[in-house]
Amino acid sequence: MLEVRAAVKAPFKLAAAGRGFMNMRMASSKSFQKITVKNPVVEMDGDEMTRVIWKIIREKLVLPYMDIKLDYYDLGIEARDKTNDQITVDAAKAILKNDVGIKCATITPDEARVKEYNLKKMWKSPNGTIRNILNGTVFREPILIKNIPKYIPGWTNPICIGRHAFGDQYKSTDLVASGPGKLELSFTPKGNPSAKETYNVYEFNGSGVAMSMYNTDDSIRGFAHSSFQMALQKKMPLYLSTKNTILKKYDGRFKDTFQEVYESDYKQKFEELGLWYQHRLIDDMVAQAIKSNGGFVWACKNYDGDVMSDVVAQAYGSLGLMTSVLIHPNGRTFESEAAHGTVQRHYMQYLKGKKTSTNSIASIFAWTRGLAHRGRLDGNERLVKFANALEHACVRCVEKGIMTKDLYLLSKSPNGYVDTFEFLDAVKSELDSELVNIA
């Protein structure tokens, strides 16, 4: 038991040296010529421990280096409750107007949260609200760090996985058949009820279950455009996975739509960059992905994406090292956030004045991905370089052995781990070193 206590206590010894080093480097951020950002970025604040971290990132790692207008929206649970969630709608509309949004992790309340925060009602997921208004596709991509082991060692390049988060099982109607009877599916064209189509689905001899689901051509087409846009942005090939051999009309619609969009709008651009697009059956795609070294964008239907995004995240090592971005079909409108939650357990410790070792990397990357997109849209090369430098600073810290507890437990670093704020100090120090190369 004594050995365990010593092991838990020792890791924080690295912190004092890390903080002192940061103070010696602070002058370089003051001498850095600030980047002028021409157009606004929508900033959406969040909840709990990620909200605490979010403010530090903004004040320590972003604002000292640039003149930027942040169109701020507080999406913390209390603000959403106070405005009857109108603040979330307003934030989404602001993203549509300004093209770039950067979001902190937020609480999606369940019954316990409604009671904890004395909420008026169980508000919907702000991510879902924003996604529906923006009509975009969410893509998750791992942050690769050499000394963080992967469960699939062969994945030396990132897999960027897109989930078509509309329709299918998640908007289905299901039922329990209480006994023998006929199950039918019907469609009545609007304005022409006499053209009603009815299909016999199954003749039940006893009790059972049934489900009906749908998707729309507009949503599938938007999903296709978002996927091709992401592949072009990442300069990676794109794969779509379905089961069209079984669902010939349903999944066949996805396959045909993607092929049409590719041929009409993206084939030439892909070929110029040496990229390709392929459709694969979902089972074959999973097998090929496992054998591959990564390095592609994977467009998944709703259920497949729900499952495979978590599989991919875990296989790369940690959900705390996953980025999440939402891309509109136009390729311009963009929202980024961390792929994880609000880290409630650490927040409870923080409120009690206890030290926490919370991983801030995904939250930092939410800022960098949004700033880089703003830079690309505005033709602001210095902003893009700054975003890349901040990402490199995070990675270099971990590769030097400066990391939070979650990554320490994965890497077994001999240096131990630092606390939440010491890691952010170390990132700033590393960033100042990186910025020497930015004119």
UniProtKB/Swiss-Prot annotation:
Source organism: Schizosaccharomyces pombe (strain 972 / ATCC 24843) (Fission yeast)
One MF annotation (Gene Ontology) recorded for this entry: NAD binding
Name of encoding gene: idp1
Gene Ontology terms: cellular component: mitochondrion
Compartment(s): Mitochondrion
Transit peptide location: 1-26
Keyword Methyltransferase assigned: no
Protein name per its UniProtKB record: Probable isocitrate dehydrogenase [NADP], mitochondrial
Family: Belongs to the isocitrate and isopropylmalate dehydrogenases family.
Database matches in InterPro entries: IsoCit/isopropylmalate_DH_CS (IPR019818), Isocitrate_DH_NADP (IPR004790), IsoPropMal-DH-like_dom (IPR024084)
Pfam families: Iso_dh
Residues marked Critical for catalysis (site): Y170, K243
Annotated positions binding substrate: T108, S125, P126, N127, G128, T129, I130, R131, R140, R163
Cofactor note: Binds 1 Mg(2+) or Mn(2+) ion per subunit.
